[in-house]
Amino acid sequence: MIPPFDPDRKRVPMTVIAVEYTYSDATAAARDEIRPDHRGWLAGLIDAGTVLSTGPFADGSGALILVSAADAETARELFRTDPFQQAGLVDSARFTEWTPVMGAFTDR
């Protein structure tokens, strides 16, 4: 994985993958039960510099996770280890390479 920052805390080029999860209302209770494991897994990836930002959609329909990875397939392989995915709680997962042009993930 490419770290989002160098040791001097300057921005460096990276490949960002936007991971979009969708959830079913039918799995809400199970997600509540597994959520501590899911968030612990994400926290480890944040500490490693792999997950850049994450959070649920306000309507509860899913979540967006921004990931620093070599490519979408690398991210897809990593996310197979997510406790939510392992428990079958993700209806669909979309992995799309995203090119930051301006803002928090760029020099502008």
Kindly give the residue locations of the regions a language model identified.
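Conserved, structured core segments of small domains
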Residues: 2-108
